[in-house]
Amino acid sequence: MDQRILNVELRSKTGKGISRQLRRSESIPGVVYGKGIESVSVSLKTKELSNAIAGEGGRNHILTLKGGGSLDGQMVIVADLLQDSLKGLPLHVDLHKINLADKIKVKVKVNLVGTAAGVKEGGLLDFAMHEIEIECLPSHIPEHLDVDVTSLTLGHSIHIGDLKELPGIKVLGDPKASIISVLGRAKEEAAPVAEA
């Protein structure tokens, strides 16, 4: 996963009024926290954050902070992003300080590869788990996890435990949890027989 720059400004004032003021000036409030540092309130440009987390890896991009005094040069990932439910615009961001030598837990998107055999037979794809939690070094975070569904037949599922092991990546979660299934098509009811 590539590293990106994110400009931040330290802020001493907090609260709803300050947050509204920041949003009117196309900025958002945020907080940086993590091992070895106290939580620090920051502000950053909305568009810059959107650009930094755009693309395939989304929130899992490693971001290097600039302009934040003691935070300058710190590496973070987006731990939480509060967005406007109607407009989708960021309202607040939590940035988690990381160390490239320490493993972290993140959620990555599931990317389906191929067309399931059961779908070709008329079944319906039930995509139950769009993201999977993994644990790895920050430099090993994949943009997504590929799940090959070509051999998936009617009435069968692919579970977390069925995933191929990837070097340096531990897949977390219940091994029996279903990621994707092919559901059988509904049986057509027989037409009622007309009485003579």
Swiss-Prot record:
<keyword id="KW-0694">RNA-binding</keyword>
<keyword id="KW-0687">Ribonucleoprotein</keyword>
<dbReference type="InterPro" id="IPR029751">
    <property type="entry name" value="Ribosomal_L25_dom"/>
</dbReference>
<dbReference type="GO" id="GO:0003735">
    <property type="term" value="F:structural constituent of ribosome"/>
</dbReference>
<dbReference type="InterPro" id="IPR001021">
    <property type="entry name" value="Ribosomal_bL25_long"/>
</dbReference>
<dbReference type="GO" id="GO:0006412">
    <property type="term" value="P:translation"/>
</dbReference>
<dbReference type="InterPro" id="IPR037121">
    <property type="entry name" value="Ribosomal_bL25_C"/>
</dbReference>
<dbReference type="InterPro" id="IPR020057">
    <property type="entry name" value="Ribosomal_bL25_b-dom"/>
</dbReference>
<dbReference type="Pfam" id="PF14693">
    <property type="entry name" value="Ribosomal_TL5_C"/>
</dbReference>
<keyword id="KW-0689">Ribosomal protein</keyword>
<dbReference type="InterPro" id="IPR020056">
    <property type="entry name" value="Rbsml_bL25/Gln-tRNA_synth_N"/>
</dbReference>
<dbReference type="GO" id="GO:0022625">
    <property type="term" value="C:cytosolic large ribosomal subunit"/>
</dbReference>
<dbReference type="InterPro" id="IPR011035">
    <property type="entry name" value="Ribosomal_bL25/Gln-tRNA_synth"/>
</dbReference>
<dbReference type="GO" id="GO:0008097">
    <property type="term" value="F:5S rRNA binding"/>
</dbReference>
<comment type="similarity">
    <text>Belongs to the bacterial ribosomal protein bL25 family. CTC subfamily.</text>
</comment>
<dbReference type="Pfam" id="PF01386">
    <property type="entry name" value="Ribosomal_L25p"/>
</dbReference>
<comment type="subunit">
    <text>Part of the 50S ribosomal subunit; part of the 5S rRNA/L5/L18/L25 subcomplex. Contacts the 5S rRNA. Binds to the 5S rRNA independently of L5 and L18.</text>
</comment>
<comment type="function">
    <text>This is one of the proteins that binds to the 5S RNA in the ribosome where it forms part of the central protuberance.</text>
</comment>
<protein>
    <recommendedName>
        <fullName>Large ribosomal subunit protein bL25</fullName>
    </recommendedName>
</protein>
<keyword id="KW-0699">rRNA-binding</keyword>
<dbReference type="InterPro" id="IPR020930">
    <property type="entry name" value="Ribosomal_uL5_bac-type"/>
</dbReference>
